[in-house]
């Protein structure tokens, strides 16, 4: 017996050759592979397959998955496929075909009495987002980020201190200890960066040994060539990443000076376009260096008619500037350039900018990383057309390029890709389920370490889960010791060896960063283009390999007002 393709999609979700529109964008993805055996699909519910003696077998808990997501459409850097996903002990155990191996063929994921089921039919499954530019100004950011689909936050801060309002720095062992202890309370993977601005190694080493997973160089603390060189030397010794916000005012040198101070060592350049800070007007040149891992922050994503006006006000507040002081106003205006922001759109589409992050509450919005990424992808498709690597009638390669910017590439950059950043067997089961119509805007379900940490949920007093008001609420993995079992605190190997988790009484699972210093841009998936960038110092026009980069600002964006009426 055969059923129509439409009926099949309605029952089990799309299969090979079917196309799905992402939210209200002009982006379409096409299913490349289906792990299902047709006629042997598993689905839970009354009269459905996953029942005793049918799709559910008799195996003990040790031999079946704890949680099964059925018939999900996976979007990840490695493919766009339809599969069942099995989770065991908080990690992704299998991607394949679920069922009862006693009676069904080709089963790679055994289902038993110990298995919970999440229906993925008609849903999109992605890895949780990794935001690597966090100012930890207030703890409420964490819930905001989680509800947007972000499951890992990396950055620095101590709360709403003036230093934290401007810089992603948790300075010194005492503050590092307090923030690590505080992070035990949140269903989020968290790692902290220390202050990198010092010219002798001792103050940096003590921060790494206290738990810092990286060091941040910020112009507001003085990003001089001496500080850059010293910071990178310590990072090389202790295998932690360095992030940099370079010298907008060009006081201690120009972009060439900073690039020379890197001495070909690996570094993550924040907001590499420059509106968020960095050598004016040409920090964007850095994205052409093989040792530079370039990212954007989300307020310039994508370039719209409102971008310039918004940025001037943001900058005055975030960097403690005084609008009555002419030099402060000139400093602000030097950072905001239409030409380089427009070029940033195109450099993302070419894969020259490799990552996207928030800059939370410090010229960025913590809950909009994912949304702004896909808005940029949509704008570029409309303005530049399909990418050469895309298949006929689909945007699969573009989708893989853009999802990598906030999942696998930041994870690789900061030495945590062995734990998070993609849907791959063995990794922490930080997973996000989306209805296609709400993709990138409002997730349906967020899993942390294999347990549901947050979800859209209706009235708790209703007779079913769906009545209004439906809004985001923390779920059971956000509470008690379940939180500690399902989320990670990242620290350096030096801190782990020094017994920092035990000495501070940390209860969350501990992840150790590794491989930070060997990463090169060529390792950043689908985003490794190394253009030769020129910036005209008078007009700010940007050229990549001799080609002028310019695009018009958008007047209207998808994934915007129609999703936020309620």
Curated annotation (Swiss-Prot):
GO biological process: urea catabolic process
Pfam families per the UniProt record, alphabetical: Amidohydro_1 (PF01979), Urease_alpha (PF00449)
Tree of life domain: Bacteria
PTM summary: Carboxylation allows a single lysine to coordinate two nickel ions.
UniProt-annotated binding residues for Ni(2+) 2: 216, 245, 271
Keyword annotations: Cytoplasm, Hydrolase, Metal-binding, Nickel
Primary location class: cytoplasm
EC number: 3.5.1.5
Active-site residues, record numbering mapped to chain: 319
Pathway: Nitrogen metabolism; urea degradation; CO(2) and NH(3) from urea (urease route): step 1/1
Subcellular location: Cytoplasm
Keyword flag Metal-binding: yes
Cofactor (UniProt): Ni cation
Binding, substrate: 218
Binding positions for Ni(2+) 1 per the UniProt entry: 133, 135, 216, 359
GO cellular component, one term: cytoplasm
Residues where N6-carboxylysine is found: 216
Catalysed reactions, semicolon-separated: urea + 2 H2O + H(+) = hydrogencarbonate + 2 NH4(+)
InterPro entries with a match to the protein in the record: Amidohydro-rel, Metal-dep_hydrolase_composite, Metal_Hydrolase, Urease_alpha_N_dom, Urease_alpha_subunit, Urease_AS, Urease_asu, Urease_asu_c
Cofactor note: Binds 2 nickel ions per subunit.
Domain Urease intervals: 128-566
Quaternary organization: May form a heterohexamer of 3 UreC (alpha) and 3 UreAB (gamma/beta) subunits. May also form a heterotrimer of UreA (gamma), UreB (beta) and UreC (alpha) subunits. Three heterotrimers associate to form the active enzyme.
PANTHER family linked: UREASE (PTHR43440:SF1)
Protein name per Swiss-Prot or TrEMBL: Urease subunit alpha
């Amino acid at each position: 017996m055969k059923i129509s393709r439409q009926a099949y999609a309605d029952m089990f979700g799309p299969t090979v050759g079917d196309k799905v529109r992402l939210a209200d964008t002009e982006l379409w993805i096409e299913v490349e592979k289906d792990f299902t055996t047709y006629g042997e699909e598993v689905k839970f519910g009354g009269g459905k397959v996953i029942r005793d003696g049918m799709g559910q077998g008799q195996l003990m808990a040790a031999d079946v998955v704890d949680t099964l997501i059925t018939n999900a459409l996976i979007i990840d850097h490695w493919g766009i496929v339809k599969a069942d996903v099995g989770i065991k002990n908080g990690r992704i155990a299998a991607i394949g075909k679920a069922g009862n191996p006693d009676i069904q063929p080709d089963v790679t994921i055994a289902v038993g009495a110990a298995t919970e089921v999440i229906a993925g039919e008609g849903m999109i499954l992605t890895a949780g987002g990794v935001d690597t530019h966090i100012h930890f100004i207030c703890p409420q950011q964490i819930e905001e980020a989680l509800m947007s689909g972000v499951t890992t936050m990396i950055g620095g801060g101590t709360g709403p201190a003036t230093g934290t309002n401007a810089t992603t720095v948790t300075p010194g062992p005492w503050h590092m200890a307090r923030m690590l202890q505080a992070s035990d309370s949140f269903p989020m993977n968290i790692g902290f960066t220390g202050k990198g601005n010092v010219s002798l190694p001792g103050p940096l080493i003590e921060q790494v040994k206290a738990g810092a997973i990286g060091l941040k160089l910020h112009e507001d603390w003085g990003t001089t060539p001496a500080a850059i060189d010293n910071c990178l030397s310590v990072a090389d010794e202790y295998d932690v990443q360095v992030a940099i916000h370079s010298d907008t005012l060009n006081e201690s040198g120009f972009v060439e000076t900073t690039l020379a101070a890197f001495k070909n060592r690996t570094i993550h350049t924040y907001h590499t376009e420059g509106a968020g800070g960095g050598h004016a007007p040409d920090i964007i040149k850095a994205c052409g260096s093989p040792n530079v891992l370039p990212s954007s922050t989300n307020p310039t994503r994508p370039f719209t008619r409102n971008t310039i006006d918004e940025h001037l006000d943001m900058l005055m507040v975030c960097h403690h500037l005084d609008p009555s002081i002419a030099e402060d106003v000139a400093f602000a205006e030097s950072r905001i350039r239409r030409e380089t922001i427009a070029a940033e759109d195109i450099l993302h589409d070419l894969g020259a900018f490799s990552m996207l992050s928030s800059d939370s509450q410090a010229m960025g919005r913590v809950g909009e990383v994912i949304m702004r990424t896909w808005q940029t992808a949509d704008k570029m498709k409309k303005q530049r057309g399909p990418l050469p690597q895309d298949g006929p009638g689909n945007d699969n390669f573009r989708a893989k390029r853009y999802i990598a910017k906030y999942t696998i590439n930041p994870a690789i950059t900061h030495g945590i890709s062995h734990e998070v950043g993609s849907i791959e067997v063995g990794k922490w089961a930080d997973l996000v389920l989306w209805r296609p119509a709400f993709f990138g805007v409002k997730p349906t379900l967020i899993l942390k370490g294999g347990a549901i940490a947050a979800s859209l949920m209706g009235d708790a007093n209703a007779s079913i889960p769906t009545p209004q008001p439906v809004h985001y609420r923390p779920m059971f993995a956000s509470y008690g010791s379940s939180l500690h079992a399902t989320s990670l605190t990242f620290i350096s190997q030096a801190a782990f060896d020094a017994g920092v988790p035990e000495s501070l009484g940390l209860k969350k699972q501990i992840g150790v960063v590794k491989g930070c210093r060997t990463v090169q841009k060529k390792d950043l998936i689908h985003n490794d283009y190394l253009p030769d960038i020129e910036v005209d110092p008078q007009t700010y026009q940007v050229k990549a390999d001799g080609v002028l980069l310019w695009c018009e600002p958008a007047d209207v964006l998808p994934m915007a007002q129609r999703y936020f009426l309620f």
